[in-house]
């Protein structure tokens, strides 16, 4: 069962892409570039979300940017789709706006 929401892709070939699933909507979200480490090495993956803007940062580099995301609130889920996946040092915390989200397009930036 796939919930309606915003997905931040962790599949190796598309790491960092942001896209809507099950009726959710957003603008943008394409993967900007590949910043992933080779298979077998750990990656650091950060997701920032504020007021409908979503930014993904992989190994310290901005790799995905979306705006006007709907829904803006909901559950956070981690999943592995058919391949072994390991997670470590998972943190969820509030933050003050970062430069990643200031760069995101939005209705107030058109």
PLM features per residue range, with description:
Residues 1-110:
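Carbohydrate-interacting regions of secretory-pathway proteins
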